[in-house]
Design a protein with these regions (language model features):
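Buried hydrophobic packing residues in well-ordered domains
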Residues: 10-11, 115, 194
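Intrinsically disordered, low-complexity N-terminal segments that are enriched in acidic
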Residues: 1-72, 253
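Sterically constrained small-residue positions within well-ordered secondary structures
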Residues: 3, 36-38, 146, 164, ...
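Secondary-structure boundary elements
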Residues: 76-150, 161, 227, 236-255
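Hydrophobic/aromatic-rich core segments of domains that either
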Residues: 157-237
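Short, cationic low-complexity segments
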Residues: 67-79, 215-221
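Sequence-level motif detector for i,i+2 pairs with an aromatic at +2
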Residues: 7-9, 40, 110, 201, ...
Length: 255
């Protein structure tokens, strides 16, 4: 994948039939719901998904943002600074990494990119067996201590590690679960990534596994403090019953 633009596309409109999703997550930046119709247990939805890298005015604000030392974030954002049993940034090993990697850095843009680079390279092996267990509902992702020890994981473990680094430096960060679709490069599949909160901007998508900002091909369906907090009953239920691209917009996107 490239820098936020797959195949050069900065905006994609998807038409889908969905079974399980969170409406607030679905209709939040960088997505917006264009049409929504409920039929029994199936929702017919059209959304527009945009690339952050193509939003130059937003990026200008993000690049100048600094960590809020007073933590004066909106009340609904504060929970995304808290540790969880799976994403516990208070672990001494994680704190050592965060302090070495990020030090006293206050620029949010720099913190995000350093965190992305570290998370995307620290995990060395994709864990197929763990992926199967998560798909079956037998695992809710590996915790930070396990990730640091094994250096193996799925997209969820890249995301957990990145979120821990962000929260350790007072950057609110949340766990995103959704679906990726952009043929012929991407035939479709469930995926996990993260979003960082920036004062004056809101939530910004990032993909820790790819080490990049979020892509417009990543369709956000759930958000939470960690994977269990997303409230997904069955991971297979978030796979769209049908999905097609109605249109897309080309744009030159550069880091």
């Amino acid at each position: 994948m490239g820098y936020g633009c797959v195949g050069g596309y900065a905006q994609i409109t998807y038409k889908m039939q969905l079974r399980d999703f969170n409406r607030a997550a679905l209709d939040s930046y960088p997505q917006r719901v264009i049409s929504f119709q409920q039929t029994d247990s199936i929702c017919h939805v059209t959304i527009q998904s945009s690339s952050v890298m193509a939003d130059t005015s937003l990026l200008k604000v993000v690049k100048s943002a600094v960590v809020d030392p007073g933590l004066s974030y909106p009340s609904d954002v504060l929970p995304f600074l808290e540790p969880t049993s799976l994403i516990d940034y208070r672990l001494p090993e994680l704190q050592t990494i965060a302090d070495t990697l990020l030090g006293n850095e206050k620029n949010v843009w720099s913190i995000i990119w350093k965190g992305l680079k570290f998370a995307s390279t620290y995990i060395e092996v994709f864990d197929d067996s763990l992926a199967m267990e998560i798909d079956k509902g037998n695992s809710f992702t590996a915790d930070i201590a396990t990730i640091l020890r094994r250096r193996k994981g799925t997209c969820s473990e890249y995301t957990n590690l990145f979120i821990a680094l962000m929260r350790s430096k007072s950057v609110p960060c949340r766990f995103i679960t959704g679906y990726v679709y952009y043929p012929p490069q991407i035939t479709g599949g469930t995926h996990a990534w993260a979003e960082c909160y920036v004062n004056g901007v809101g939530w910004i998508p990032v993909d820790p596994q790819a080490g990049q900002l979020g892509f417009p091909v990543e369709i956000k369906l759930f958000a939470g403090k960690d994977y269990p907090d997303c409230g997904i009953k069955d991971l297979s239920d978030i796979v769209p019953l049908s999905i097609e691209i109605e249109n897309d917009t080309y744009s030159r996107c550069k880091k």
